Amino acid sequence: MKRVLGTLFLLAAGLAFFGCTKKDENKAVKDIIAQAEKMSFQELLEKAYAESNGKEVSGIGNSSRGKTAGEKFVEEIKKVHPDYTGSIKWSQPKNNSIFEALTKDTESANPVQAVTLIQDAAQIKNKMISTGILYNFIPKEWRETAGVNIAADGNPLALQTLSKVFMYNIVDGSKKYMNVWDFVKEGEKPMFMGLDSEPVGKNFLYMLTEKKYVKYVKDAYQALSAEDKMYFDPIIREIKPKVKELNLTDDAEYSLAWIKLFVTQFNKMTDDGPISTEIVKKSAAGQTALIVYSKLRSINESEETSVNNIAVAAYQDGYEGFGGYAYKHYLQIPKNTPYPWTACAFISYMVTNKDGFQPWGKDMGGYSSNPSINQDHSRDGYVDGVDKFPAKDDRGYSWWVSPDFGRLVIEETDYCAGVQFSVGLWIDSLKK
């Protein structure tokens, strides 16, 4: 009873906090964004030059690569105006503190943050957008590019979609994981970052309760053997009442059962880096992981470690269920940005210019929201014309998000924010 009352209190508190009205809008910044959305990148570049020449423009983000993008942006201005002496100062807060940092900066007497690259859809919506701390900007040339999905990536504006995929060690060949339910069988302990260390992992679990992804989970269950179904059936039946309690779609008990097993069984790790170096070892035979796909790029080949010691689950013929999940990096403008024109130009540069996206696009597993500036990584495993590391041959965004192939579970801002204080609290009750 105490747990129920506590949950209800937290739910009410959360709704009260995040349901409050927006803070006073900054009309001047809003007006500049409205003008900027009608301008070309070159026009924005002129505005940025006039606004920030000789100034230090601060940016803050979840990705350290924003620093490289900022340096490239400055060089882009100098191509047109060699006398430009402005700079981009980039910072990367640790331990999920970016929300607090942006809030404090916005409320300070002299805000300094001009632009942000931020992740975690649920918190962005509930803490930053609904409260009016961050403003959205959609560049004209991005909006007009063929293949851009404005509905999925425009509000908030996504820089990129990043994939985290299931993989397993194949050194002794003792196990094959051909169904996403295989990763939550009795005794399985996939290596995964703790949910408090990287909350985008919780967004993945939230999205599993959305109708589209519920079908992925149920379809994978139906492909199981009769013996495997006998193991999972009691768990699914026991959890079914939660579907109504959490106001979820039909058949969500399949997703809730999978989530419960995953959350209570996974091997909690501090970061994807250590997971990636562990899963590729000969000594890690039979181990599994759910990690950022791009980590495979930095594996040092040796007698003990090799990319060829693992298999990407979704790449196996006949694999059933989702192959992993995808989260996004979003580009936003703080409401009290001191350099709104420069922020708009910088954002436009990152989503419309191949050089602007290059700090992220140079690696597999990250896909720009603008398909025209993505790089091809389908032969990243080739050495001297020979495909020596097939697991590194990225099949691309379209393959990974297809319901017929990779079936990534993709975070959606509104859905994640909407279930954070229902499904999210239930997940918290499961955590070890």
Question: Where do the model's predicted regions map?
Answer:
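Mature extracytoplasmic/periplasmic domains
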Residues: 324-408
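Extracytoplasmic/periplasmic substrate-binding proteins
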Residues: 253-256, 264-336, 383
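Bacterial signal peptide processing site
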Residues: 21-23
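Immediate post-signal peptide segment of exported/extracytoplasmic ligand-binding proteins
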Residues: 25-27, 33-57, 78
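Extracytoplasmic ligand-binding site segments that recognize negatively charged/polar headgroups
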Residues: 56-75, 88-103, 111-274
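Conserved C-terminal helix/tail region of periplasmic/extracytoplasmic solute-binding proteins
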Residues: 30, 37, 393-432
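Positively charged n-region of N-terminal signal peptides that target proteins for export
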Residues: 1-4
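C-terminal motif of bacterial Sec signal peptides marking the signal peptidase cleavage site
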Residues: 16-19
